[in-house]
């Protein structure tokens, strides 16, 4: 990995659709503007950006979508939300229940109802890409949901366990999958394609000298939050 340090300190980062966002330990929200993490108004504990828009949740688990210059609340409660799917929203609540919102409902919003779809299972973290969603449960076991589309955000409806243990996982808009385990090690899933969305193996890589906390990938750039909160921007090298 070819990495550079970006000024700032974050606990969570997300890159998608050409944007990069994050939050710090004070739940202040940041957007990358001209390679500088710039504070914007609003308090969030998790912030996600992607084809579904800019979405976040606060410490009370309220859900917000950034719309015309400010955050507007969506109906429902989630502790973590993801905007990386094909205009679908996905996330998990405080009980590790899993929900998603189809493209039509997301794009029609704000409307009188927000028809969240519950997905069978329990996950503490859930992230979607163009054709699959990946998640981890409270035991750090890894699961994939296949056949996810903009109109069927729940996919096939049944999770498949993938060998390995991760504490967080992110699927990029191009389908790439990266994750971090509880020891702070960084992994990429190899062999991921539309026809084989679960890929083949985990390979480890190092971007942070003292361990990794959070990872996201977009447009060929890997964005890392290290254990100490410092930020790395890395280019994948063969």
Curated annotation (Swiss-Prot):
Keyword list, A-Z: Disulfide bond, Glycoprotein, Lectin, Repeat, Secreted
Localization: Secreted
GO MF entry, a single one: carbohydrate binding
Intervals holding Sequence repeats: 1-34, 35-68, 69-106, 107-156, 157-199
Task performed by this protein: Lipopolysaccharide-binding protein with a very low agglutinating activity for human A-type erythrocytes and interacts with both Gram-positive and Gram-negative bacteria.
The family this protein is said to belong to: Belongs to the tectonin family.
Keyword Repeat: yes
Tissue: Expressed in the eggs.
GO cellular component: extracellular region
Sites carrying sugar chains: 27
Disulfide bridge positions per record: 3-234, 100-153, 128-133, 208-226
Claim: Hydrolase is one of the keywords in the record: no
Phylogenetic classification of the source organism: Eukaryota, Metazoa, Chordata, Craniata, Vertebrata
Segments of this protein annotated with the region 5 X approximate tandem repeats: 1-199
Protein name per UniProt: Fish-egg lectin
